[in-house]
């Protein structure tokens, strides 16, 4: 699906990976996260091949939910806090409070838009060097899209980069570098 791709992301940049469905955006992101292996060429992040070493510097929001819907939001925050040394529990709680979401809510009791927001909160609560966000605004209403984009802008470090994939180009043009 991908040929002759050369991608160099500078720190502090907000980069869009734009294109129609089926154009290789998710494949690129899976290569960057080590979920797929290239058939030719190499992939490196900060000089390392994607894997355990890069998991500590990359915060990844997949295009599909990967959380147990029976869990309470508080339990998921506990899990992320235990799993990621760079997870900022205070930041996650502040973002939840801004949404008026109870940490005692189970994921399955939340709307699709609010489940997406919880996943985004988890991703953006890490002090990562690279945030890779796969279609974070797909399938949610325009108000949720605005919240998601504003949350990303307000919560990534200027020392970090954001790579956001989408086919909804008009919705994110204003935030891209």
Language-model regions, residue ranges each:
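Walker A (P-loop) phosphate-binding loop of ABC-type ATPase nucleotide-binding domains
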Residues: 20-24
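Helix-to-loop junction immediately C-terminal to a conserved catalytic motif
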Residues: 33
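Conserved ABC transporter NBD signature motif
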Residues: 40-54
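Helical segment within the ABC ATPase nucleotide-binding domain
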Residues: 145-158
């Amino acid at each position: 699906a991908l040929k002759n791709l050369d991608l160099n992301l500078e720190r502090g940049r907000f980069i869009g990976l734009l294109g129609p469905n089926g154009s290789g955006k998710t494949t690129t992101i899976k290569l960057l996260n080590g979920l797929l292996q290239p058939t030719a060429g190499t992939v490196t992040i900060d000089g390392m091949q994607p894997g355990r070493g890069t998991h500590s510097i990359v915060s990844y929001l997949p295009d599909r939910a990967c959380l147990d819907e029976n869990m309470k939001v508080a339990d998921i925050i506990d899990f992320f806090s235990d799993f990621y040394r760079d997870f900022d529990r205070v930041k996650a709680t502040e973002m939840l409070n801004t949404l008026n979401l109870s940490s005692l809510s189970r994921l399955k009791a939340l709307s699709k838009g609010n489940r997406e927001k919880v996943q985004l909160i988890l991703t953006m609560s890490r002090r990562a060097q690279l945030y890779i966000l796969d279609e974070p605004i797909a399938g949610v209403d325009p108000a949720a899209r605005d919240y998601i984009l504003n949350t990303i802008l307000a919560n990534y470090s200027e020392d970090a980069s954001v790579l956001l994939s989408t086919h909804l180009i008009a919705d994110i043009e204003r935030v891209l570098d």
